[in-house]
A protein has these predicted regions:
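Conserved pre-ATP/AMP-binding loop-to-beta segment of ANL
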Residues: 32-33, 161-180, 187, 212-218, ...
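Conserved AMP-binding/adenylate-forming
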Residues: 16, 42, 57-104, 222, ...
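ANL superfamily adenylate-forming
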Residues: 3, 41, 126-172, 187, ...
Length: 541
């Protein structure tokens, strides 16, 4: 293949990059005896972690996993989930983690859509393992205790103890991680993250979010490792920082603060809802959290009053960033120095910060033209942190990119100094407690109820979660009446709890456009006219 020579330059002679698992190799060499992972009463040194990862990689290779194969992982946070990430990287395979709160049918779809060859499934989810089985999935291994699967990950590691597995040679564009996101249709899409891109992401996070981080720091995990927290902990591994897990999937705030004090935790990645809960909990005053240097939050806007409360309790340690899975969190940053506890012109209320190092943001109109300061348009971004594209989804890729720019789907403006302000979303997606929720997914499940003929789900403001869903329903003609409690009980086993609408309303009809569509803005206007938005905000979460 002939590579055209750039005018006035030279075609790149090599696309080889570091395999991300080399960071583990480095830690085993330089910090081998230092603790790298803590969970409950167990801890592992970096040398032990490297050994477990090689053993798991050897087992996967023996079972036929090679470079480019996808390894699906559905698990709560635990040691073996963390090992699986580096084992996939080491082989040049692709780590495909899911949100452990998903339903079995949703995980089955992801198994098929990703083309997964192997499935590592936590023992608490036998129905997910059963649902995900398909002709392309060659084997299922169990994480932890349980009664399903060809064998357990623990058994595989024990069988291959002492194995030496080299880090596979990789190029910049070789995939390492399928980061599941969602489109406006509600179907999850696999954003392809690569070794070269993620090396930049790691470097950028260290430079912009937590400068000066070293092996003497410590990081507490308070979110699922399948998404943003997984990226955050990968960054920690680059500096030999130990990762500390909560003892169970239940978020125990007192235990979190106890761990912060006991291990002198210096950084946390979280979302505004969790941060608000931590700051308002009595434990914030019982434990010493003076070791915290960076409390990094993202995933949703944070109310100004909540910001001030967090600053007053924790000190000047808040760092905000704006970024999607497709850009691996690398769009803007609002560093601790710009989080002012006092209101005033200097406080820059409402901004999500300025462009990350090495990234460029453009506010564009529908025609792709760059808009002037304070003009509202779509937030678009270019730079090394942008993903390769969506796996096996040319239609989504065509919509997501324009003239090389990635289109976030978020609306906003930029001031004259380059600070970005998010003003809305181009889609109907809403964010509740840091989780993206796409109404169509929930609407489809509600419409399986025999008494419901039409439904519109939309996000509305909530003082606790940022936004919550409400479902406006119209009964099927001739159907028996259904109560709010009955519909909630019907929906509960069909959607994860975080996707459950906070309220269900029943109307005679939904507002429609001239084309027979149900515009969400008209539904929202009607909710407001009836005083229901205020009612929702006053309902206990």
């Amino acid at each position: 293949v002939t590579i055209p020579t750039p005018r006035g330059g030279l075609a790149r002679m090599s696309r080889r990059v570091m395999n991300l698992a080399h960071m583990l190799t480095q830690n085993a060499r330089r910090h081998g005896g230092r603790t790298g992972f803590l969970w409950g009463d167990k801890s592992w040194t970096w040398r032990e972690i490297d050994g477990h990862v090689s053993a798991l990689a050897a087992g996967l290779a023996e079972r036929g996993i090679v470079k480019g194969d996808r390894v699906l992982v559905h698990s709560k946070n635990c040691d073996e989930m963390f090992w699986s990430m580096f084992a996939a990287f080491r082989l040049g395979a692709v780590w495909v983690p899911t949100n452990f709160r998903l339903m079995p049918d949703e995980v089955a779809y992801l198994a098929t859509a990703s083309g997964a060859k192997a499935f590592l499934c936590h023992g608490d989810f036998p129905e997910h393992a059963k649902a995900a089985a398909n002709p392309g999935l060659e084997f299922i291994w169990r994480i932890g205790d349980g009664g399903f699967g060809e064998k357990s990950v623990g058994e595989v590691i024990a069988e291959h103890a002492g194995a030496k597995v080299d880090n596979a040679a990789v190029d910049y564009d070789d995939p390492c991680w399928f980061f599941f996101t969602s489109g406006t249709t509600g179907r999850s899409k696999a954003a392809v993250l690569t070794h070269g891109q993620m090396a930049f992401v790691v470097t950028n996070h260290l430079a912009d979010l937590m400068p000066g981080t070293t092996e003497t720091d410590a990081s507490l995990v308070v979110a699922p490792l399948s998404h943003g927290a997984g990226v955050h902990q990968l960054v920690q591994a680059a500096r030999g920082v130990p990762t500390i897990l909560l003892p169970s999937e239940k978020f125990d705030i007192a235990e979190a603060f106890r761990l912060i004090e006991a291990h002198r935790v210096s950084n946390i990645f979280t979302v505004p809802t969790i941060l608000k809960m931590m700051v308002e909990h009595p434990a914030v005053d019982r434990f010493d959290h003076s070791s915290l240097r960076f409390v990094i939050y993202a995933g949703a806007p944070m109310y100004r009053e909540d910001q001030k409360a967090a600053l007053n309790k924790l000190g000047p340690v808040l760092v905000q960033y704006f970024g999607l899975g497709e850009v691996t969190g690398n769009i803007t940053v609002m560093p601790a120095s710009l989080h002012d506890p006092e209101d005033g012109p200097q406080a820059r209320i409402g901004t999500c910060g300025f462009e990350r190092t090495g990234m460029q943001v453009s506010i564009q109109g529908d025609d792709g033209r760059e808009l002037k300061a304070f003009e509202t348009g779509e937030i678009c971004v270019i730079g090394p942190a942008v993903f390769a594209g969506y796996y096996d989804n040319p239609e989504a890729n065509a919509k997501a990119f324009r003239d090389g720019w990635f289109r976030t789907g978020d609306l906003g403006h930029m001031d004259e100094e380059g600070f970005v302000y998010i003003t809305g979303r181009a889609s109907d997606m809403y964010i509740s407690g840091g989780s993206n929720i796409y109404p169509r997914e929930v609407e489809e499940k509600i419409l399986t109820h025999p008494a419901i003929g039409e439904v519109a789900v939309l996000g509305v403001p909530d003082p606790f979660w940022g936004e919550v869903g409400v479902a406006v329903c119209v009964a099927r003609e001739g159907a028996a009446a259904v109560s709010e409690a009955e519909l909630a009980a019907f929906l509960a086993p069909k959607v994860p709890r975080y996707k459950m609408p906070k309220r269900f309303f029943f109307w005679e009809a939904l507002p429609k456009s001239g084309y027979g569509k149900i515009p969400k803005r008209l539904v929202r206007d009607e909710l407001e006219a009836r005083g229901l938005l205020e009612l929702v905000s006053k309902t206990d979460s």
